[in-house]
Amino acid sequence: MDIKKILAEVKRGCAELIDEERIENLIKNYYEKGENFFIKAGFDPTAPDLHLGHSVVLTKMAFLQKHGAIVQFLIGDFTGQIGDPSGKSATRKKLDKEQVLINAKTYKTQVFKVLDKEKTQIKFNSTWLNELGAAGIVELTSTFSVARMLERDDFTKRFKEQSPISICEFLYPLLQGYDSVALKSDIEMGGTDQKFNLLMGRQLQRVYNIGKEQAVIMMPLLEGLDGVNKMSKSLNNYIGVTEKANDMYAKILSISDELMFRYYELLSQKSLEEIAQIKKDIEQGNLHPKKAKENLALEITERFHSKEEANNAKSEFDRIHSQNALPSDMAEFEIQGKIWLAKALVECGLESSTSAARRSISANAVSVNSQKVSDEQMYLEQGEYILQIGKRKFAKLKVKE
């Protein structure tokens, strides 16, 4: 087995590796001695759905599962009630325990769309953090100083601006680091925004003398559909892993050619050599960028659905956009009495709020019965309407008298 080649794939797309030699030795020991190793990634269930941004880390872990890794998929049901302060300019609202548990349940069903179930352990950090107790918390907090905490850019900025920083937020990185002590992880993965917390795990493993120090693999934050901001549900630039095949396929096709290669690098399971060949073929005019994007959309859609559903999504997309046809699975709604268009867009699930709907109207992105609409105050009287936003969102609305 070519360990160097495997390590090159591990490093692919990574923002930073800490203790690369340890990662190499873990893989080598698996092939030479049959010893598995443990790779941890924590996810606070603060929202009900995972998106492709989350799957960047999952995809890398899935690759490592083929080379000896047992994934410790850690659901932060305890820390999720605090909220990770990383990159935040204000104290996060404390989440309700019931909502955290509901979100955690959906994570358990979604994660196996990427990871090998037989090589994955689902863990909840309440298991050990609930047992830590006051004495354990005091011992944990004694391992780190306030001065070190204030080295974090986000805390420093808030401190200088005299914005509140709760003691809970100081506790968060300590608790995340303690997770690595409890799990005895060999590697921890996370985004670049998690560096402080990930290094905390290494330090606490040393302090608690568990006989190992985890290596760290940091992945870049995946840009959303806009190609500028990180993928986020709040920015509405995301692709959810549970989205319908048609929507997933269409959204991937909407990204720019430049962003396409970023997605290939971080989300595709094609080898580095295969991706290099795709780039070369495009540069030499042997492959159209649109075809390369279609192939990427098919690959990702198939991973989260099935080959048949991915192919059907492609056929449906081609039918709609080449023939100016309407989606065959367009949702239908009925409303009693005339309705403000912005509200109708929300009622039909095409927008999340009337404010967002008005922005779409002012951006000339909304059509009613194939006619562009620019009047934000437009009302729909009795009749039947085809509502459309952009190229992907459609709904049929019947307004009754």
Curated annotation (Swiss-Prot):
SMART domains in the record: S4 (SM00363)
InterPro entries in UniProt: aa-tRNA-synth_I_CS, aa-tRNA-synth_Ic, Rossmann-like_a/b/a_fold, S4_RNA-bd, S4_RNA-bd_sf, SYY-like_C, Tyr-tRNA-ligase, Tyr-tRNA-ligase_bac-type
GO-annotated biological processes: tyrosyl-tRNA aminoacylation
Domain S4 RNA-binding: 339-399
Pfam family, one: tRNA-synt_1b
Subcellular location: Cytoplasm
CDD domains: S4, TyrRS_core
Function: Catalyzes the attachment of tyrosine to tRNA(Tyr) in a two-step reaction: tyrosine is first activated by ATP to form Tyr-AMP and then transferred to the acceptor end of tRNA(Tyr).
Subunit and interaction comment: Homodimer.
Protein name according to UniProt: Tyrosine--tRNA ligase
Source organism of this protein record: Campylobacter jejuni subsp. jejuni serotype O:2 (strain ATCC 700819 / NCTC 11168)
